[in-house]
């Protein structure tokens, strides 16, 4: 099946960050086979021609760190620091989850993400009360591209920890798929919730199965102080001593890093998922993304969970990310719009090991989203496309979402998930949680 999308303004995110006015994209099944400017001449003898009527077409956004199973917990525990927020609000509520609640919560997060333009994401879920196969089936049904990882903790007894490791290893062996729509990573929660033995076992599983690692690291000053007091090393050095960085690793946050640590992360192919809104809301601080990029670290933008954000709008994250860097460095050139867009598209895709997506180029997966600026005053005049995407647009502006060549959202309507049922069930299950 060959489909051509014509009369589009195409934000390619190729090496030149080329924006093609009045162009077209040809998709064959799940792959882009041509991207050009001008009028389509039907040289490829396509099956369908779709008129985009001047819409902006850009790569689907890539969210490098989420917790979609937590989506029911939006608005719970506002205005709290990370540790008490986790210990007194989030973990007690997650302990009440059932497989049905977990699926309903996941569906809500998936619906919000895909309708706001996210096509790929990397996720960590707490396995308590969760049917992991049901979660993976739910993500698959959404049509999204994802790395969904089972989180490991050292809570409970040593036998509990051993069982958690065994279950996580089975999960990795079942779901790791380097080139598929769904894959997974090895995901120890953090150095402050995992024992040294557990972190070492996670490193072993990652090496033996050739997977990536996903972990919260260097998120707060308290974490750095506590880990240094307990192990005599800062979190980066401690994680490295456990062997975690033997495989490409994504660290969520990286707020508290020094110059030596940034250089070390770059040398060891450790990537950073930058969560600006969540870090601000939890009072964790502001990650120095400018310094990370200058050190050669791969960085991708992320939302974290709705419980700490409180939405999954990647456009908002792009805007906050660039404004924060300009502010903390007192440098208006810090993190320009092209870089912000890169960190939410092709750069983010590279961070989570999904190089097959993130730009609109021949040979890439047909993952793209559209915005119609014609009826949106906040996107007018419409000629400064890149600027508007970062500084003016929001996820609410999305018209269409195509993932792997399939229309997942069309004219604002999600085709893969039942929006009315999902919203109803989310409210019903939320009321049943004992706060």
From Swiss-Prot:
Query: Which cofactors go with this protein?
Result: Zn(2+)
Task: Locate the residues binding substrate.
Answer: 94, 150, 189, 219, 304
The entry's Zn(2+)-binding residues are: 65, 67, 216, 304
Instruction: Specify the superkingdom.
Output: Bacteria
Q: Spell out the Pfam families in the cross-references.
A: Amidohydro_1 (PF01979)
Class of enzymatic activity (EC top level): hydrolase
Instruction: Give me the reactions it catalyses.
Output: S-adenosyl-L-homocysteine + H2O + H(+) = S-inosyl-L-homocysteine + NH4(+); S-methyl-5'-thioadenosine + H2O + H(+) = S-methyl-5'-thioinosine + NH4(+)
Which protein is depicted?
Answer: 5-methylthioadenosine/S-adenosylhomocysteine deaminase
Task: From the UniProt record, report the name of the gene that encodes this protein.
Answer: mtaD
